[in-house]
Amino acid sequence: MTDQTHIRNFSIIAHIDHGKSTLADRFIQICGGLSDREMAEQVLDSMDIERERGITIKAQSVTLDYQSRDGGIYQLNFIDTPGHVDFSYEVSRSLAACEGALLVVDAAQGVEAQSVANCYTAIEQGLEVLPVLNKIDLPSADPARVKSEIEEIIGIPAEDAVEISAKTGFGVDLLLEELVKKIPPPKGDAEGPLQALIIDSWFDNYLGVVSLVRVVNGAISRKQKITIMSTGKSHLVEKLGVFTPKPLDKTVLGAGEVGFVVAGIKDIFGAPVGDTITATDRPTTEPLPGFQKVQPRVFAGLYPVESDDYESLREALNKLHLNDAALHFEPEVSQALGFGFRCGFLGMLHMEIIQERLEREYDLDLITTAPTVVYEVAKSDGTVVPVDNPADLPPPNEIEEIREPIIEANILVPQDYLGAVISLCIEKRGVQKKLQYMGGQVALSFELPLSEVVLDFFDRLKSCSRGFASFDYEFLRFQAAPLVKLDILINGEKVDALSLIVHRDISMNRGRDLVERMKDLIPRQMFEVAIQAAIGSKIIARSTVKAMRKNVLAKCYGGDITRKRKLLEKQKAGKKRMKQVGKIDIPQEAFLAVLRVNKDS
C-alpha cells in the first residue's frame, strides 16, 4: 500500500484536439508503463470508434510510478477525459476522484469554450488547476498571448504555465516535477471504515461487472466482503488491481488509490456509477456524495430492422447503460416500425456513437427515427406533461400552450468571424445576451431553442467560422412558443414515425420540402402514391409518386377506338382496386429525410 503523501490523483482536461491523449501517451512512456513494443498512439483510446474519429469518449484511468528528482517514488493516478461537450458528465465524474487537474491548452489556438467549461467544473469541485501549454513546437504557437487569454477568460494565474510539446516529449518531465510539487496528496483516513466511490463500470462476459473505484477512506483487499450501499447487497472481492494501462493485480487498494474491483456481480444494475462501496463487517454510515443524474436532452426511436432482434437490442442497451450512465431508454411501439425503444441522449454526437456501438459491438441492424427534444405541454385542465415523441402530443383542443427547452450557448469566436456567427444564431431564433471582447477572441452568450441546436448547429458553427469558433451550452428553462405538429400522410394514412414538432412560421416550408424529398425516396408502385403534409386536419403540401403502368394497347394494331378504351378502363379499375388494398414499404432513407430537411432548411 502506498503512503498517501506519495499519491497524486489528477485529470487532464482540455478542448477537443488539444492533445490530452497524446500527453497521456508521453506520461506512460516516461514512467515505463508499457514497453516500446506495446506502445501505440493514443493508447488509452481503446474503442475502435474513438481511434477512427480521433476523440476520447470514455474516461480511462492509469496508475504509474514516477521517480522524482528528489529521490521519492510517487504513484500517479491519472484519468484521461473527453473534451466534447456531449461527454462533459464523464469529465465531472473523473474530477470527483481527483485532487488536481491539468488544463491543457493548445499554444496556437488558445483557450476554447470547452476548456473554460471543464475548468470551471474543476474549480467548483475544489481542485488545484495547473495550466499547461501544449504544441509549443508549432510555428504558429504564441505562448504569451495564450497565457494572457487563460488569465483573462478563465481567471487563473498562468505566468508559470509549463510549456510542453506532447508530440515530441519536450518539457513533459518538467511538467511531472511541477505536478508532484503543486497537486495536493489525498486526505483520506487510512484506518477508518471503507468508503470507495464507483467512478465507472463496464460489463465483462467472463468476470461480470468490473468497477473502477477511488478509495476515499479505509482500504479494500482481496477476499473481503463488500456491500454496495444503494442496493444493500454483499459480494466477495475476487480480484482487484490497477491499470498501468495493462491490468495489474494487487492484494490491497489503500486510501487515496484508484483501481478496479471485480466482485462477481452478474446483475447489470448491481454496481451503479456514483455509488459507494463499504465493508460488510465494518460498514460506514454515510454514503459519499455521488454524481448528479444527467438529464437526456435529445430523444430518438431505435428499432431493429428484423423484429426478432428486439430482445438482443434490449440486452445490448442494458450493457451499454452500465458503461454509459447518461443513456436512457424505454420500450415503445410504432405502427409503422413495430417494437423498439425510445432512447434519450445528451446530444447528437452521443446519439451517433451509441448507434455505432450497437451496430458494431452487438451486430444489430437498426432504424433510427428523427431526433426530438423534450417539450412541456400545458393542457387546458391545468396539468403539465413532458412530451419527447411527437406521436404522444395531446389533441390540439386539449393544449393550452407548448413550451420548448431554451439553452444558454456560450460561444468563443475570433473577431473576424463574429458577423457570420451572430447571423447564424439569429437565424436559429436566438436572443443575444452578452458580448465581450477578450484579446483577439469574442465571448458571446445567446439564448437559443434546443430544438434548433440539436441537429446541425455545431457543424454550421464550425463551417461559418472555419473551425475556429467553439461552443458549450447549459439548459436554462422551458418557454412557451407557437409550435405545431406536422404529420406526414402516405395514401391518407398517418406515419407516426415521420411526425415532427415545428415552429409555426417555418411549418409550411418544412412540409413542402419534406414531401418533395419523400417523393424521390419512396419507390414507384403499380398504383399512385399520395404523400401529404398536414397540420391538424389541414393539408399544407402534397406530392404524388406516379404509378408504373404497363402499355395495354401494345397488342392492338389499328382497330376501333372503343376496343382500346375498354382495355384502358379495365386497367384503370384494376389500379383503383389495388390502391385500396396496397401497402407501401417505407425505406430507412425516408426516415432520415426528416433529418436532412431539418439540416438544409
From Swiss-Prot:
Reaction(s) this enzyme catalyzes, per UniProt: GTP + H2O = GDP + phosphate + H(+)
Keywords associated with the record: Cell inner membrane, Cell membrane, GTP-binding, Hydrolase, Membrane, Nucleotide-binding, Protein biosynthesis
SMART domains cross-referenced by the UniProt entry: EFG_C
GO biological process: positive regulation of translation
Top enzyme class: hydrolase
An example molecular function term from Gene Ontology annotations: guanosine tetraphosphate binding
Pfam families, per database record: EFG_C, GTP_EFTU, LepA_C
Membrane topology: Peripheral membrane protein
Localization (cell): Cell inner membrane
Xref: CDD domains: EF4_II (cd03699), EF4_III (cd16260), LepA (cd01890), lepA_C (cd03709)
InterPro entries named among the record's database cross-references: EF-4 (IPR006297), EFG_III/V (IPR035647), EFG_V-like (IPR000640), G_TR_CS (IPR031157), LepA_C_sf (IPR038363), LepA_CTD (IPR013842), LepA_IV (IPR035654), P-loop_NTPase (IPR027417)
Binding, GTP: 17-22, 134-137
GO cellular component terms, semicolon-separated: plasma membrane
EC number: 3.6.5.n1
Domain annotation tr-type G: ranges: 5-187
Similarity annotation: Belongs to the TRAFAC class translation factor GTPase superfamily. Classic translation factor GTPase family. LepA subfamily.
Function: Required for accurate and efficient protein synthesis under certain stress conditions. May act as a fidelity factor of the translation reaction, by catalyzing a one-codon backward translocation of tRNAs on improperly translocated ribosomes. Back-translocation proceeds from a post-translocation (POST) complex to a pre-translocation (PRE) complex, thus giving elongation factor G a second chance to translocate the tRNAs correctly. Binds to ribosomes in a GTP-dependent manner.
Name this polypeptide is given: Elongation factor 4
Organism: Methylococcus capsulatus (strain ATCC 33009 / NCIMB 11132 / Bath)
Lineage, top ranks: Bacteria, Pseudomonadati, Pseudomonadota, Gammaproteobacteria, Methylococcales
